[in-house]
C-alpha cells in the first residue's frame, strides 16, 4: 500500500513540471481496486489517496486489474477501464492461451472517455503496475496481426497505432529487471506458468522510476 505523502509529492512534481492531464494509478501484483478489500485502500491503506487528491483539485483515477494476471492482460484491461468499452484481448492471444476474448463481465463506461492523443494521461504504477504501464505503451504504439494472411486485429487498441496517448509513465519500486518472487508464485500456483509475462524497453514518452 502506498503512503499519501509519497504519492502526493510525485503527483505534484508531475503536474508542476508538465500540465494538468489526468493521472491514472495502476496497482501491482496481488493488488486490488477501490472497495474490493473492505476499508483497506491499496492507495493509502487507512486513507483514500485517490479521493484526497481529487478533493484538492487533482484529476486522479485508479484501475482494478487481475491480481495475478499477465502484463499483457493487465495492459488490455487498463486501456478499456480508462477509455471505456468491451475488453478485447485480441483473437491471436485469446486462441493461443485459450481464454475468452471478450469477457461478458468486463465492459466499462470509462474513467476518462476523452482519452486520446489530444487528451493524454499520466500513468503511475507501483511495483508490477509499472510493467503494466510499459506494456500498455507498447500496445498503444503498435499494430498487431490476427493471422498470417496479414489481417489486422479487429480490436480498436490492437488494430490501430495510438501514439501520443500517454504523457508520462512513473514507476515506483518496479522490478524492471525481473523478480525472484515470480518463480515462487509459479511453483505455488502452477496455472500461472501459462500466463505470458513480458514487457518491452521503450523511451517515449517520459518514464520516471523512483
Can you annotate each of these PLM segments?
Residues 31-32, 68, 131, 177, ...:
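Active-site loop signature of alpha/beta-hydrolase-fold enzymes
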Residues 4-13:
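Sec-dependent N-terminal signal peptides
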Residues 204-210:
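Single conserved hydrophobic/aromatic residue that forms the stacking wall/gate
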Residues 79, 89, 94-202:
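Serine-dependent carboxylesterase/thioesterase catalytic core
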